[in-house]
From Swiss-Prot, chain B:
This is Sm-like protein LSM3B. One of its GO terms (biological process) is deadenylation-dependent decapping of nuclear-transcribed mRNA. The keyword Cytoplasm applies. It is found in: Cytoplasm; Nucleus. GO terms for molecular function: RNA binding. It comes from the Eukaryota. Residues 11-96 form the Sm domain. Belongs to the snRNP Sm proteins family. Pfam families: LSM. The modification N-acetylserine is found at residue 2. Expressed in roots, leaves, stems, flowers and siliques. The lineage of its organism: Eukaryota, Viridiplantae, Streptophyta, Embryophyta, Tracheophyta. Component of the heptameric LSM1-LSM7 complex that forms a seven-membered ring structure with a donut shape. The LSM subunits are arranged in the order LSM1, LSM2, LSM3, LSM6, LSM5, LSM7 and LSM4. Component of the heptameric LSM2-LSM8 complex that forms a seven-membered ring structure with a donut shape. The LSM subunits are arranged in the order LSM8, LSM2, LSM3, LSM6, LSM5, LSM7 and LSM4. LSM3B subunit interacts only with its two neighboring subunits, LSM2 and LSM6A or LSM6B. Transmembrane segments: none annotated.
Length: 96, 98
């Protein structure tokens, strides 16, 4: 499996490395149900996660079909529901 | 390997522990939500909740008008064991933030 994931920025090579590298970064978490969760602003980030993909995030916004549905002060998401975790590039925030 | 590594990396479950004996909001599968006091939980997110209000949301589509009718049903339960595999999300109760 060498070579897989080398497109990813810099040092991450395995999923485990990715999970170590994203703590404290802004992410988008998409669930199996299609709902996705983002930090409410670029400074709002993933607090921590574990090997089961359980996730803790601050100031999370919930989007269903692209529409903002809910906001949470802190959110713990059970890992089995997670479809993916994606990092977000820190560019100028597009107006929401 | 890398320079700094905390001796005890905090897991999401450690942070849920901070909510013990506090009221929390739980989102479950099947469009259900719970609000109650967290008495206990485990790594599966099995939980014991007290003084719980459950909200079930259903969306009906009218055959003729195709309008969506959103209904919520609520019930209160004094003491509840929640099986962890149904849990999607846990959060402190939604507050009116400043």
């Amino acid at each position: 499996m060498s070579g897989v994931g080398e497109k990813v920025s810099g040092t991450t090579k395995t999923p485990a490395d990715f999970l170590k590298s994203i703590r404290g970064r802004p992410v988008v978490v998409k669930l199996n149900s299609g709902v996705d969760y983002r930090g409410a602003s670029l400074s709002r980030t993933l607090t921590c996660l574990d090997g089961y993909m359980n996730i803790a995030m601050e100031q999370t916004e919930e989007y269903v079909n692209g529409q903002l549905k809910n906001k949470y002060g802190d959110a713990f998401i059970r890992g089995n529901n997670v479809l993916y975790i994606s990092t977000v590039n820190m560019t100028v925030a597009d107006g929401a | 390997m890398s320079g700094e590594e905390e001796a005890t990396v905090r897991e999401p479950l450690d942070l849920i522990r901070l909510s013990l004996d506090e009221r929390i909001y739980v989102k479950l599968r099947s469009d259900r939500e719970l609000r109650g006091k967290l008495h206990a939980f485990d790594q599966h997110l099995n939980m014991i909740l007290g003084d719980v209000e459950e909200t079930i949301t259903t969306v009906e589509i009218d055959d003729e008008t195709y309008e969506e009718i959103v209904r919520t049903t609520k019930r209160t339960i004094e003491f509840l064991f929640v099986r962890g595999d149904g849990v999607i999300l846990v959060s402190p109760p939604l507050r009116t933030a400043a």
